[in-house]
Amino acid sequence: LTCSAMDARLAGLPFPAMSIVGSGSHGILCSMPVVSYGRFAGKTEEEIIRGVALSCLITIFSKHYTGRLSASAAVFWAGRGAAAGIVLLMGGSAKEASAAMDHMAANLTGMICDGGSIGCALKHPQVYAAYLSAMLAMEGIAFRIISA
């Protein structure tokens, strides 16, 4: 669902997309995976809204520190938010959400933005990594990111 929405957006089809941090790509990528998981898991509308809200807040917070333009692909920033939102829907804690975001950062570091084009849409199957990161975190699998 997320990849189809991104493909349609980047192909220029006339469908609306929620924008966040000045980008429709970020809006789609931080909301659709959480909504999809929430519906799949049978969560209530309120639970899904809370998951999307957390995802959006984390995406905004993360993107704030990169400036308006960044060489990192949208899925890098919005995927971290989506992972945390999915963890919330799974009943996870802040510790597990943090671990899921670390997994996403490690998984997608180096994915470079090449502009909003069809080539950009090829990167967005990586939103599945948000789900996998949430699953790893919920199983207690985490690692520390060590700064140099």
Task: Place the predicted regions along the sequence by residue.
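A glycine-rich phosphate/pyrophosphate-binding beta-strand-loop-alpha-helix module
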Residues: 26, 31, 42-61
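Accessory "access/gating" subregions that flank catalytic or transport cores
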Residues: 1-25
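C-terminal structural cap/anchor segments
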Residues: 67-69, 77-96
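Alpha-helical support elements that line or immediately flank enzyme active sites
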Residues: 27-43, 83-91
